[in-house]
Design a protein with these regions (language model features):
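Glycine/proline-rich, positively charged
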Residues: 26, 36, 79-172, 178-185
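Conserved, mostly hydrophobic/aromatic
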Residues: 6, 18, 46, 59, ...
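A short acidic, amphipathic alpha-helical/loop segment
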Residues: 58-62, 148-149, 172-176, 201
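Short hydrophobic/aromatic-enriched beta-strand-loop microsegments
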Residues: 69-72, 155-163, 233-240
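Structured C-terminal cap/extension of enzyme domains
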Residues: 37-39, 43-44, 170-252
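A cross-family glycoside hydrolase active-site/sugar-binding cleft signature
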Residues: 17-19, 47-49, 73-75, 103-106, ...
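Short glycine-enriched loops at secondary-structure junctions
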Residues: 22-24, 51-54, 78, 140-144, ...
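N-terminal binding-site loop/beta-alpha segment at the start of enzyme catalytic domains
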Residues: 1-70
Length: 252
């Protein structure tokens, strides 16, 4: 499997990452088992959020002893600076670490920037100076906000929905990130469950050498599907191209 460099973050990881939102639905033992097997199977990038109830705690339980071998991205949906300070403090405690590799504004309604009056971006920079945050990222669902964030040059990573059901504007966003050496993290690479063929989903993503997909995983059988891609990486062929085109016709 391809190793990708996530923009200018210094993060190099297999193009196959763990989305930890669903493990909040698992009991501790199940979650720890799945997370540990993901790491042992070769996954090194784990994405979570303060909003995902106990997801961060489960990552801390499962992976704190291999912290230096993995990359952790988490998120804050804080509405003000004081709340963001509390969020980061709680996240670090839950994750059993003193830093996160990427700290992301969660579902940002706008492009936070220095001097915008909120003080939010300046606080992120302060976290970074203190060594608690290594890279500043942002996640959003609105393409216009995403484009503004990329064009601003303020962020190390962009997390945005991206799958083979995405349109040309989303593909252009990926290209913009590549041009600016900005990491692109693909959420919802299964289009919120509309895509059922994991090989077709992966084969589409594999065409983009700057895109890191995060797969939401809560069952071991799901994990084993994605780990199978480590050894036998799906590439777009006639069969998978047919599945992709059929889904596009049906679901567009």
């Amino acid at each position: 499997m391809r190793q990708i460099a996530l923009g200018k973050t210094g993060i190099v990881t297999p193009q196959n990452a763990f989305g930890a939102l669903p493990v909040q639905r698992c009991d501790d033992d199940t979650a720890v088992n799945i997370l540990r097997k993901a790491y042992e199977g070769g996954m090194t990038f784990f994405d979570t959020a303060r909003a995902y109830s106990d997801s961060e705690k489960k990552i801390g339980l499962a992976l704190s002893d291999v912290r230096k071998e993995i990359f952790i991205a988490t998120k804050t949906g804080a509405k003000d600076k004081e709340e963001m300070k509390r969020h980061l403090e709680t996240s670090l405690e839950n994750l059993k670490t003193d830093y996160v590799d990427i700290y992301q504004f969660h579902l940002a309604p706008r492009c936070f920037a220095p001097g915008d009056g909120s003080g939010m971006y300046e606080l992120m920079e302060d976290f970074k100076r203190q060594g608690m945050v290594r890279n500043i990222g942002i996640t959003c669902h609105k393409i216009g906000v995403a484009e503004e964030c990329v064009e601003s040059g303020l962020y190390a990573t962009m997390q945005f929905p991206f799958s083979y059901l995405s349109g040309e504007r989303e593909k252009k966003l990926v290209a913009m990130c590549k041009e600016r050496d900005m990491g692109f993290i693909a959420m919802k690479a299964l289009a919120g469950g509309l895509i059922s063929n994991f090989k077709a989903a992966y084969a589409f993503i594999e065409q983009f050498d700057n895109v890191l997909p995060i797969w939401g995983i809560q069952r071991e059988e799901e994990l084993m599907q994605w780990l199978s891609c480590m050894e036998d990486t799906p590439a777009k062929n006639e069969e998978l191209a047919g599945i992709i085109e059929a889904d596009r016709r049906e679901l567009d």
